Structure formats: C-alpha cells, structure tokens
Swiss-Prot record:
It is an enzyme of class 4 (lyase). PROSITE patterns: ACONITASE_1 (PS00450), ACONITASE_2 (PS01244). Its EC number is 4.2.1.33. GO terms for molecular function: 3-isopropylmalate dehydratase activity; 4 iron, 4 sulfur cluster binding; metal ion binding. The keyword Iron applies. This is 3-isopropylmalate dehydratase large subunit. Its cofactor is [4Fe-4S] cluster. The gene is leuC. Signal peptide: none annotated. Pfam families: Aconitase. It comes from Xanthomonas campestris pv. campestris (strain ATCC 33913 / DSM 3586 / NCPPB 528 / LMG 568 / P 25). It catalyses: (2R,3S)-3-isopropylmalate = (2S)-2-isopropylmalate. Heterodimer of LeuC and LeuD.
Length: 479
C-alpha cells in the first residue's frame, strides 16, 4: 500500500469524482459564513430558486464590520455608523433567518471571529473539509482538517451543492524540531517560516506543519501557525491529529456524543501522515534558532528577529528585491540598518483570527501585569476573538490587568486587523499588531503595520517601542 500524507488522506476521503481535466469534485463538510462574502451568494440562491443543500452544515457570524466598543454594541445594528458595514451585517441576519441557517448574531455571547468561533464550538472537527469566504480559513487545519478560503461564487456553490471543484495540490512539509526558547511563540515560528520561504514559498501546495516543536504547541498555537499558512503562499495549512486535538474537541457543542464520539475518535487517530509518506518539498527549522520576530516592511516575508536591523537595500544583489526593500522603507518611514528596537510606535493591537484566543490574552496580560502603557502610545487595544473568549478572560481577571495597565478592553470582532470597521490606523502611524498582514493600507490608509506575537505587542505597548520580551523582568507564565 502506498504511503500517504495527511493531505492525501483527507483529499481521498472527500473526492466525489475525478474529472477529465484533472480536477475533482470535493464534498464539503462544514461551511462558515460571515457578512462580507455571503450577500451575493445568498442572492444567487434566490434568483435561481434554490435552497441550501444541507442547512445544518452551515453556521454564520458577523465579524469584519462589527464595532468593538461596548456603547456601539449596545446600540445594535443602528450603532454601526458606516452604511455599507451596517447593511452587510443586517443582510447576513436576514439571509440566515430566511434560509434557516444558524447565526451567532452581533450581540450573541457566542459571536466572534469566524476562525475563533468554529473551533471553540466544535463545528470544526478532525477529518472535515472546511471552507469559508475568507483566506484565513486555513486556521481550521490545526485540527487535521482540510480547510481553505473560497470566493463569493464558490460560497454560492457550496450552499447549493455542498461540493466544490478543485485541483489537488502538491505536498509541502515544514518540520520544526527542538524546543522553543522562553519568550518564543507559535507566532514567531510562523513568521520565521515565512521569512525563510517567502510569501510564494507554499504556492500550489498544502502545507503540513510537523516536528517536535509543533507537537509541543497547544491547539491555540497550532491554529496560529495554520492561520498564516496563506501568508506563506499555501491555501491549506494543517497539523496531524493527536491527543491534544481530541481533548480540545471533546464536549464542545457540535462535537459527537456517546458511541458516535468513540467511532469518530477511532477515525481521527488515523489522520496523520504515514511514516514513509513522500512530500514534494520539505523545509526544516530548529526551534532553538528562532527568536521573537518583528515584521519591518509591507509583506509578511519582510521580517527579522528582534535583535536585528532593518535591511539595507544596497546590500541586496537582486534588483527586484532591492526595489521592493526601497519601496517598503519609504512607505514604512524607516531607514536602512535601523535597529528594530529603535522603531517607535503609535498604537498597539492585540487581537485578530491569528492571536485573539485565551492563550494569547494570557500571554499579553503576563507582560502587562504591573506595568503601564507608555505615554507615547496613543492607543493600545485588546480585542477578544469571541464572546466566550471575552467571558473566560474576564473570569480570570485578565480584563482588569489590561485596564489597569492602560489598555482598552473591547468587544469581539476583527477590529484593527483590517480597515473595515471604526478601529483604524491614521496615516503614518506605526502599529505593533498581532494580526497576519502588513500590506500597505491594511489597517488604514497610510498605516504602518508591524506583525508580532501577543507578548511582543504587550512589551511594545509598555515600552513605547519594540523590545525583546525575554529581557523584561517578572513575567509570570501559565502552563
């Protein structure tokens, strides 16, 4: 029997038929919807007189456009000041009501970012195919699922048929062996990977993260690395199932129960790459070599360790790369060879589908505890990824730690990750952000984004500039 990768197994489990052109019809187990990419899809169903093929396979929640201040949320839909944003959230409510789809509406305690809500509800299960009209759907691959983003026309196709046409990708394995040093996190791993292979390194591949350092990560850490596989060029990121996966899923609302649970677990334990499976490409990193990472430019691959400097374009031999560095330096307002620790900041954002789970908030709070946000920081936001994360953080007293330190404690949503709601950067402002993209204007027109881990973001907030979180004293960690 031919040895198979995890991706091979998941593909074969869901391949309905293979077409003459080499593409396949793939069955979709779970479809997650939000307000931005679904309106035209629902309208397409109406115009064609169709109904969803499997209503129970869909769940929805608004996240991109929702405001995050308590006052705005208490005001309901009418408090959304931007007309287009308000219409999108309202339309999602109406579409889900009309088609009978379960939605966690804006002020439901279960509402949150789609890629936080799906896993915490157990709607994402090992072995599933999971799609959503959002490129960071790769997050769900942390559960040994085949998950990727889709476009609006494909959202309609899944609603109508529960299937998609796709071509099988190549297999890429990223192995991270060893033990992560203190202060180095899952976010630092994935930024280091992107810095090594570039934003095109995973093009055309399904990326499986493996190795002892990956196995040592919590499920939340695995979600972080899979979330940013798309920034490495791979639509699909995944981690094989193990006992951590099963323990995380057990007892969640959508998880199987009783005999169904036992049968599911037996299957899930097979969702690993065979020992002698062949990958088209293998990339290796040593965990001990990874340091806290900070992006300096306008692409996630423009990233260096905290103890390094902004690159000098004059040292780059490739003219295309040299031009790219020069453009990024100009946009970011940085100088060649500037130490990362000399980058001063205006705002700090802790949140997004990459880093807004309870583990992320605990890590940031451990740094913030007993400290104060620097007087030069205009705003430091902490935005939980869901209402349930927010409630848990408040039960643990994390909100008080942040508030005492001078951070703002917000309601769940995508927030400052992208400029589609009131949380935005001003032109020329530098932000230490736990999000996933640092493109020009991503957080607001002219805004300058630096991608970091939650601990590094909190350290920057209390220092006013980037510092090595490992050098701060008195940080309490939780196992």
């Amino acid at each position: 029997m031919t040895a198979k990768t995890l991706y091979d197994k998941l593909w074969e489990m869901h391949e309905v038929t293979r077409r003459d052109d080499g593409s396949s019809l793939i069955y979709i187990d779970r479809h997650i919807l939000h307000e931005v990419t679904s309106p035209q899809a629902f309208e397409g169903l109406r115009l064609a007189g169709r109904k969803p093929w499997r209503i129970d396979a869909n769940i929805a929640t608004p996240d991109h456009n929702v405001p995050t201040t308590r006052a705005e949320r208490q005001g309901g839909l009418e408090s959304i000041s931007d007309e287009v944003s308000r219409l999108q959230v309202q339309t999602l409510d109406e579409n889900c009501d009309d088609f009978g789809i379960l939605e966690f509406k804006m002020n439901d305690t279960r509402q949150g970012i789609v890629h936080v809500v799906g896993p915490e509800q157990g709607a994402t299960l090992p072995g599933m195919t999971v799609v959503c009209g959002d490129s960071h759907t790769s997050t769900h691959g942390a559960f040994g699922a085949l998950a990727h983003g889709i476009g609006t026309s494909e959202v309609e196709h899944v609603l109508a048929t529960q299937c998609l046409i796709a071509k099988k990708m190549k297999n890429l394995q990223v192995r991270v062996e060893g033990t992560l040093p203190f202060g180095v996190t899952a976010k630092d791993i994935v930024l280091a990977v992107i810095g090594k292979i570039g934003t095109a390194g995973g093009n055309g591949h399904a990326l499986e993260f493996a190795g002892s350092a990956i196995r040592a990560l919590s499920m939340e850490g695995r979600m972080t690395i899979c979330n940013m596989s798309i920034e490495a060029g791979a639509r699909v990121g995944m981690v094989a199932v193990d006992e951590k996966t099963i323990a995380y899923v057990k007892g969640r609302p959508f998880a199987p129960k009783g005999a169904d649970w036992d049968a599911a677990v037996a299957l899930w334990r097979t969702l690993v790459s065979d020992a002698d499976a062949s990958f088209d490409t293998v990339v290796e990193l040593r965990a001990e070599d990874i340091k806290p990472q900070v992006s300096w430019g306008t692409s996630p691959e423009m990233v260096v360790a905290i103890d390094q400097q902004v690159p000098d374009p004059a040292a780059e031999q490739d003219p295309t790369k040299r031009d790219s560095i020069q453009r990024a330096l100009k946009y970011m307002g940085l100088r060649a060879n500037q130490p990362i620790t000399e980058i001063h900041l205006d705002r700090v954002f802790i949140g997004s589908c990459t880093n807004s789970r309870i583990e992320d908030l605990r890590a940031a709070a451990a740094v913030a505890k007993g400290r104060k946000v620097a007087s030069t920081i205009k705003q430091a936001l902490v935005v939980p990824g869901s209402g349930l994360v927010k409630a848990q953080a408040e039960a643990e007293g994390l909100d008080k730690i942040f508030l005492d330190a001078g951070f703002e404690w917000r309601e769940p949503g995508c927030s400052m990750c992208l400029a589609m709601n009131p949380d935005k950067l001003g032109s020329g402002e530098h932000c230490a952000s736990t999000s996933n993209r640092n493109f020009e204007g991503r957080q607001g027109a002219g805004g300058r984004t630096h991608l970091v881990s939650p601990a590094m973001a909190a350290a920057a907030a209390v220092s006013g500039h980037f510092v090595d979180v490992r050098e701060l004293q008195g940080i309490e960690t939780r196992e």
